[in-house]
Amino acid sequence: MNPRITTPASALLLAMLAGCGGSDGAPAVLDAKASEAACTDIISKSGLSATTLTTSYVPAGTKRPGTLTTGDFLPGHCVVTGAMNPRTGVDGKPYAIGFQLSLPDNWNGRFLYLGGGGNDGTLRDTSLSSSISGGTPSPLGQGFAVVSTDAGHTGTSASFGADPQARIDHAYNSYDKTAVASKSLISTRYGRKPDYSYFSGCSGGGRQGMMFSQRFPDYFDGITAGAPAMRVSSGATVAAMWNTIQFNAIAPQDASGNRILSKAFSNSDLRLVANAVNATCDAADGVVDDLAQNVNA
């Protein structure tokens, strides 16, 4: 076991999809100059209203997923960053539905929507999914067009709740708008819609997946909704508050006296727990490899 959170359902989905072919025929790969030009042209050709777009082209062989320093490089891809429906909220703060969409040169005809988590407020790196472990290639590396959204606000606190529209955006509207805009931009870039579309998320992202399955069931061909955080106003919130209080009690402080919650448990603490889990659960999946994959054991 590695002392970090993974999402087995998402990993299973991506593993299955990696074994599936894309659309009929091999993925089309354009030369770098043509791909960069097509990336730039997205802005003028998108046709999206009330939307500001910026694009940047990442040549093949120049970047790995996320901040990884080893492993396979990503294919050439276009990163589209957008802000939809910009406005000033009732609290005087600026709001917009932000999203990041990565469009690979070797597109396999498939689209993956990465769910968020917590209060959202940040754009997930679409070159890297939290489900990647044990050498699993990133979705972008497999040829997926991949999108994430900040859910209509910036910052991970819940202060956006003071604005009624921001609450609606976080509940469902931003995810709807992002899905529709993403498919439109995919059509702009490749000249056709995705052959298959998928959503993958856990906790807050799991709630988003459940929301899609109820409100917009035609958007995706498959949804993984891991540990959906649905009744957050009930006991789950009280439990989270209690956990935060306890973490504050043991976490070290920075130079300004603020608690560093990410260091509430030291590396030796995490390794102690990981070793205990490995000793009990690792072999249950048939392979001793520091990965406890048989969650039902």
Located regions from the model:
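A catalytic-pocket lid/entrance helix-loop region that shapes and gates access to the active site
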Residues: 211-213, 218-297
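Catalytic-loop region of hydrolases
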Residues: 22-110, 123-126, 133, 274, ...
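Glycine-rich His-Gly loop
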Residues: 86, 116-119, 228
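Cap/lid segment of the alpha/beta-hydrolase catalytic domain
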Residues: 108, 116-194, 237-238
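Bacterial N-terminal signal peptides that target proteins for export
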Residues: 1-9
